[in-house]
Amino acid sequence: MAKPTSKDSGLKEKFKILLGLGTSRPNPRCAEGKQTEFIITAEILRELSGECGLNNRIRMIGQICDVAKTKKLEEHAVEALWKAVSDLLQPERPPEARHAVLALLKAIVQGQGDRLGVLRALFFKVIKDYPSNEDLHERLEVFKALTDNGRHITYLEEELAEFVLQWMDVGLSSEFLLVLVNLVKFNSCYLDEYIAPMVHMICLLCIRTVSSVDIEVSLQVLDAVVCYNCLPAESLPLFIITLCRTVNVKELCEPCWKLMRNLLGTHLGHSAIYNMCRIMENRSYMEDAPLLRGAVFFVGMALWGAHRLYSLKNSPTSVLPSFYEAMTCPNEVVSYEIVLSITRLIKKYRKELQAVTWDILLDIIERLLQQLQNLDSPELRTIVHDLLTTVEELCDQNEFHGSQERYYELVESYADQRPESSLLNLITYRAQSIHPAKDGWIQNLQLLMERFFRNECRSAVRIKVLDVLSFVLLINRQFYEEELINSVVISQLSHIPEDKDHQVRKLATQLLVDLAEGCHTHHFNSLLDIIEKVMARSLSPPLELEERDLAVYSASLEDVKTAVLGLLVILQTKLYTLPASHATRVYETLISHIQLHYKHGYSLPIASSIRLQAFDFLLLLRADSLHRLGLPNKDGVVRFSPYCLCDCAELDRASEKKASGPLSPPTGPPSPVPTGPAVRLGHLPYSLLFRVLLQCLKQETDWKVLKLVLSKLPESLRYKVLIFTSPCSVDQLSSALCSMLSAPKTLERLRGTPEGFSRTDLHLAVVPVLTALISYHNYLDKTRQREMVYCLEQGLIYRCASQCVVALAICSVEMPDIIIKALPVLVVKLTHISATASMAIPLLEFLSTLARLPHLYRNFAAEQYASVFAISLPYTNPSKFNQYIVCLAHHVIAMWFIRCRLPFRKDFVPYITKGLRSNVLLSFDDTPEKDKFRARSTSLNERPKSLRIARAPKQGLNNSPPVKEFKESCAAEAFRCRSISVSEHVVRSRIQTSLTSASLGSADENSMAQADDNLKNLHLELTETCLDMMARYVFSNFTAVPKRSPVGEFLLAGGRTKTWLVGNKLVTVTTSVGTGTRSLLGLDSGDLQGGSASSSDPGTHVRQTKEAPAKLESQAGQQVSRGARDRVRSMSGGHGLRVGVLDTSAPYTPGGPASLGAQAAPAARPEKPCAGAQLPAAEKANLAAYVPLLTQGWAEILVRRPTGNTSWLMSLENPLSPFSSDINNMPLQELSNALMAAERFKEHRDTALYKSLSVPAAGTAKPPTLPRSNTVASFSSLYQPSCQGQLHRSVSWADSAVVLEEGSPGEAHVPVEPPELEDFEAALGTDRHCQRPDAYSRSSSASSQEEKSHLEELAAGGIPIERAISSEGARPTVDLSFQPSQPLSKSSSSPELQTLQDILGDLGDKTDIGRLSPEAKVRSQSGILDGEAATWSAPGEESRITVPPEGPLPSSSPRSPSGLRPRGYTISDSAPSRRGKRVERDNFKSRTAASSAEKVPGINPSFVFLQLYHSPFCGDESNKPILLPNESFERSVQLLDQIPSYDTHKIAVLYVGEGQSSSELAILSNEHGSYRYTEFLTGLGRLIELKDCQPDKVYLGGLDVCGEDGQFTYCWHDDIMQAVFHIATLMPTKDVDKHRCDKKRHLGNDFVSIIYNDSGEDFKLGTIKGQFNFVHVIITPLDYKCNLLTLQCRKDMEGLVDTSVAKIVSDRNLSFVARQMALHANMASQVHHRRSNPTDIYPSKWIARLRHIKRLRQRIREEVHYSNPSLPLMHPPAHTKVPAQAPTEATPTYETGQRKRLISSVDDFTEFV
């Protein structure tokens, strides 16, 4: 604690002492002084006196000096010491003595100074009056000690100034000057009178001395004078001169400027500036460079330097003239300083400088530039030009306020010394004055060009001048083009081709090009001459040029490229301007230049670039029908020139003829006659370019150029006017292209190819050109055509295979004579192409198209047909290809199988079956056995031997080659109990739970695991329909739509009808009962009065609904009255009642009575007497006895299959048992005679029946009387020796090659291989020897396929649409009336009918005439009820038909699919063998059998069915036929008949006229098109009149038949499809329909539209707005009867439709190709559209029919199960998979299996009849 206290107390003491409050301490110095005061003794004085020797005195003086410095001497001791030694200062004394005394004085002054007093004056006087000028240093030291270095002059004031002056004269040194500085600072007032001489002396010292130290100290003295005294005015000039000189010393520059700045800050500042200006202007100082430089420096620094003195008011204008004068004599240093000074002035105060100041500055600059001519100073030159650059920058920044003209004159005067940037500014400035408002502006432009272009070597400057010239030309050429070109351009630029600067050459060439582009005078040729000289430079590199220098050399040739590209631009402009001769010359110049490339073999990259761009432009040339040339703009729209033609001159063109080829190219439309002089038209013959193109194809070495030419050629070849209006040899073009592909050295000559380049890339580029060249086939030699086809065949092995296939498809259409010879080999080659997704669509569409060209494959052997199937079958694999490809593959297989020659089909069935198994069925199987089928089944090596040999079949019992026998008897055994169709049970038991999904992409394992069952079933159903199709057509060519002749209608009138479900077929049997005969002979007056209505007519129940333009998935029958648009749909399939006269050639109507007389009679027919009423009584009685004889024994069998219907009409030839009371039927010959005899009794010979038998309708042949040899063979004739044991097979079913036995789908053991496929093959193997060629089957196309006429018919189609159109449609239609049916008889097959009969009998008295009750209709359909009286419905009973009020109408015969009559039905029990129920039914039958048998005439249909089907050991219940049990199932059959057995397509057709490409309303408003459009429509199909169409026979796609949608349209058909075209121009354009909605409701709902684009502009997808417009087939008409076909599709369709394909097709084949493209696109669109609803996928009507039949079977099963729930269903659940069980025992023989089945179960066939 003590330490802080002591510390604090110490601080306090210090503060007290500081403030003077503390106790005073004794002064130690005083005490010490008193103690140390030195006493001068006498002895000391004696030793100092003269008594002693000199040396002793000097020694003692030294000792006293030490004492005097440190100790105080006693009072008066100094005086004593001075007196003792003063004598030693005499001059005669030695210097040592003097120096010792002076040292003693210095010591006394230093040690005893404050005690000397007046002695100071004494000592100063001693120094001042020193006898000599020696000892200056010692004296100065004493003076410094006396004055404390000049600070204190006490007692010295009066004599000090004089002493200083004296001393400066003798001893002016730096030491003295330092003392003088202090004297001036501290005692200046004592020096005033002597300042001037002092300054003078110091200035002289500064000027004369060379010591920088002296000068520096002198400057300090002068600074002290200026700062602490007043510099005399008279000393100012010398003072300034001194500083001006001194400032040139580098080390003294700063102190000098500081001193000058101090001076200028005084009142003498302006005087100093003035003096310095005087110095600069004084002629006497002109040679004194340092002085002038210093003056310039000080003035510049003082007035505008970094530390300028703002007190100075001198302006730059006042001092700059002095600067100018200072430069009178050239001096590098002065000029340099002046440049620095004015540069500083300009940079810092540029905004404050006035014009006057700038004038002086420019004078100075000009003088500086002049001095540079004489002064060799790089530094000065650099700084002077930097000064000019600074001024330029001010000009650029608009901060220069002087005269720009004068400045740029300076720059121009010394332009060769100025940098490029300065000259560019100069040229820019000069260019501003070159305009017509300036006098002599053209001369100024000439001078500018002469000065800075011709005589200048710097590229940038010359380029700038060219820019100025270009700008002047651009602005003034409109009025002064003549003068500018004459005076400036040609004179100044004529030397450009020889100019050494390649950049200048390039820009000058570009200028010439720009000028020539707009020049329309004779000077154009002069300009083009210069350009041609530039282009004439050789593009070959020097031989000694090294490879690394090639790039530099190529850059020097850029002017040539500029010239060529410029000519392209000029040509593009000159095409549309006059005179046209300019365009001609440019075109010829270009062609000549490119020819030089190939002549001299230019191979530099720049040469290739020139050719690349030249060809890129020239191949854009287009021509129209008037031969006018044109080019497309940036939007692709071609604008044609009114002045330039693509042909040669008229005389040349008239004399030109084709040198080679079978035909000369047509001259096309004549060239337009010019309205003015002939010279106004220019001729640019395309042949010149064509020859260069040929050179390119033959000699080009750069792949980029060649690829460009090949890519552009196809589009150019579309414009045939280009080729045919001048001598262009397409033969040579074809030859060159083919040589490129065949020559092995083609690849060797090419360079610049990408990595991995191969012949494949070459093919990819050449094939499109060959494709486009196909349209020139008429003008190609046959040899060239064959070469083209050969090259396309060779391309099939490369990546361009898809393009080659498309090209070959076009060849097939356009060059049939060539392709027909190559086609057999080509088809075989196509089998070598791997089945990939990229090849699928082109290949399948090619085969689809080829199938419709029968004249091409009429000579095909079995190998070619097998190749087609080998190509198609792999694409049926749903795990590899999308749904469209699979469906298209099935379509191709079906088409080719139908078109295949009949003898070959049998052997193709197992081949196709195996392919389907390996590609489709096994893809859904996960069992190990499927691996054996993974090998490609369609390999040609796996074909049957009979197909590979393809020999002609021998004549014998069977015309087809022998089939391959089954190797295992168990396979044949299994076939006998299986149906050919893949049953639903087997399908579902074989399908895996994870398969391909509905996506269109190719499936992989992951997608297969997530697929849904609908798509799995779809592909299996496709396989089923394919097998069903082969069963239909393997032994026949009959169509899928049977027709019933009038004789058949007569025979089967009122017949008994039953329908069975056998596998996937519906078998309807109708037997005759004699009703037609009785009606004919008038024996049944009730029938005739009733209009002879059918007793089995279910079509009398009809309903009328308003028709809407709905999508027609299945073609429902439509019949519209003239008053309203009603669709009349009957229960038998929605087919309307016939209105008008019956078409005697209408399609077949099985099972129905053709009341021909009633249908042909007018409405008042019931009032006329019957034919039978005119007969005499005796004759009538006679004929009554023959009624049973006439028609009993006849039966009709109608088989409904997924792929169509087949019908037989047959007669029973077996004689009746002698124990029977029935009368045998009359043979057909006698029946015909009887019918003819009956006609003799008729008085009214104009009845419809008579006409139908004797007078054919218009366009319809008279039905011939059938001879006995052509009748259907009797059953007894079926039994051939080779067919014993196969009696259950019917020869009548030869076209399907199957028996009516159903396989056992419910067996516990299901083999891996589908049994249906084995059954089908077995059926072919066992039935071929059982066929009878005389089995009669009605068909519209039964002629031989080998006949050419039949080939053409197949090409046109197999479904006779034209026969479905009434040929008497113009006749007035008659009203419909419903007549009472035939008397209904009770049936022995169903107890329910008896009850119904009783009820109907009770209601008979309450009926109203004209309404037939549904119950009565049930009986009329079955044809088995009693015939005592007609049954009528009660008045209040609901009816499904509204009878027209006009009166009763005669009903037509009922129809089934496409106009077929629906089958009657019998309600029967079709359940499996159930003993209890069968006993009850048998008991009931036994009660009614006798009476029914007596009342119902004719043969029971069950008798016919059992003869064809029955086998006593068919297997379990699921194999048995199923009899349709009730009316609801009959309606299902009628619904099946509504689904046509052919695919339907509806295509929109629109015409786009000129200017309509973007207007939907204008397009829809078109009512007609061009002539070529009309021809195109004519070829699309057959023109039909809608009002005469029967919609149940002709697919109309929703078109109204009473005129609402027009009167006519076009439709087309072939064997398996129908297409209708919704043609906008044929639809009415209604004024009230402003938006054309009536048209758009059809056109907008069509998936595919054919757009005939005659507008000359591009048509864009979406112009016609619609939700379902997926694809557009765009037809663009070209010249010379050719057309361009392209496809447009929505983005989501791009994977299904190839929009990159463009086809050029002639008018002759346009309709065919467009229709094919539209049909294929529509198939793809249907697949795409149905993808959005995968639960309802119907890619074809065949599948729709198949599914309908399967649903019918399921319904029957469910109803049977419902009626007896105790019984199990026949089949396992639909989605239950039945595992396959491997057999554990050896396969039993046929006899063993038959015996086991017979023992286990003997069938009771009465259950299903």
UniProtKB/Swiss-Prot annotation:
Ubl conjugation recorded as keyword: yes
Post-translational modification (record): Phosphorylation at Ser-939 and Thr-1466 by PKB/AKT1 in response to insulin signaling and growth factor stimulation inhibits the ability of the TSC-TBC complex to suppress mTORC1 signaling: phosphorylation promotes dissociation of the TSC-TBC complex from lysosomal membranes, leading to activation of mTORC1 by RHEB. Phosphorylation at Ser-1388, Ser-1420 or Ser-1422 does not affect interaction with TSC1. Phosphorylation by AMPK activates it and leads to negative regulation of the mTORC1 complex. Ubiquitinated by the DCX(FBXW5) E3 ubiquitin-protein ligase complex, leading to its subsequent degradation. Ubiquitinated by MYCBP2 independently of its phosphorylation status leading to subsequent degradation; association with TSC1 protects from ubiquitination.
Region (Disordered): 1078-1136, 1330-1359, 1373-1392, 1405-1492, 1764-1793
A single BP term in Gene Ontology: protein localization
Expressed in which tissues: CNS, uterus, heart, skeletal muscle, kidney and spleen.
Chain positions found as Phosphothreonine: T927, T1271, T1466
InterPro entries named in the record: ARM-like (IPR011989), ARM-type_fold (IPR016024), Rap/Ran-GAP_sf (IPR035974), Rap/Ran_GAP_dom (IPR000331), Tuberin (IPR003913), Tuberin-type_domain (IPR018515), Tuberin/Ral-act_asu (IPR027107), Tuberin_N (IPR024584)
Membrane topology reported for the UniProt record: Peripheral membrane protein
Top-level taxonomic group: Eukaryota
Subcellular location(s) of the protein: Lysosome membrane; Cytoplasm, Cytosol
Function according to Swiss-Prot or TrEMBL: Catalytic component of the TSC-TBC complex, a multiprotein complex that acts as a negative regulator of the canonical mTORC1 complex, an evolutionarily conserved central nutrient sensor that stimulates anabolic reactions and macromolecule biosynthesis to promote cellular biomass generation and growth. Within the TSC-TBC complex, TSC2 acts as a GTPase-activating protein (GAP) for the small GTPase RHEB, a direct activator of the protein kinase activity of mTORC1.
The protein's name: Tuberin
